[in-house]
UniProtKB/Swiss-Prot annotation:
Pfam families: CoA_binding, Put_DNA-bind_N. It is found in: Cytoplasm. This is Redox-sensing transcriptional repressor Rex. Modulates transcription in response to changes in cellular NADH/NAD(+) redox state. It comes from Lactococcus lactis subsp. cremoris (strain MG1363). GO terms for biological process: negative regulation of DNA-templated transcription; response to redox state.
Amino acid sequence: MTDHKPSKSLPKATAKRLPQYYRLFKSLVEENVTRTNSQLISEKIGVDAATIRRDFSLFGELGRRGYGYETKVLRDFFGELLGQDQETHIALIGVGNLGRALLHYQFQDRNKMRITQAYDISGNPLVGTQTDDGIPIYNISDLEKNVKKSDIKTAILSVRKENAQEVVDTLVKAGIKGFLNFAPIRLKVPSDVVVQSIDLTKELQTLLFFMGAQEE
């Protein structure tokens, strides 16, 4: 199989499907399925077979015509692409309702990816405490100092949109290179920093639109 690392030119739609592919091949290996094909993959994850083959072609020869794909090989391949074996520490900014839920979220496919620090304003009674599994919740005034002393390069933002950019600016100065952003605002960051935004309101509105279209 060709050894091929993803480049910055990898289509975003393809990149978003990588975790699906990894999760599927991981599950198939656990079910003792040794080989599969694009049609069966399509049925499992709801992506058409042509798209799957096109995605896979971006990485070289992942399978053989008439033979299909070896599940263990592709589990390991996509796992490596996604950094499954790397220890990833994350800072959570904002411990409101959503933030508290995220603190207790189990990253099922990546047990080496975990939140190790959380932050909020001094008015939050949780500041100065820690979760049951030992995650400290700091005052946001300590954010830059603490992150600089840590190995954290990734942050989750669960703050009000009017505060989000200021928090991001502070974290970029502290060395953060990637953000998962739940604030409904477009963040300005340097070219070497990655932002993945999730707008829950927009996602729900899109869902309702498609539900309405189904009823017509």
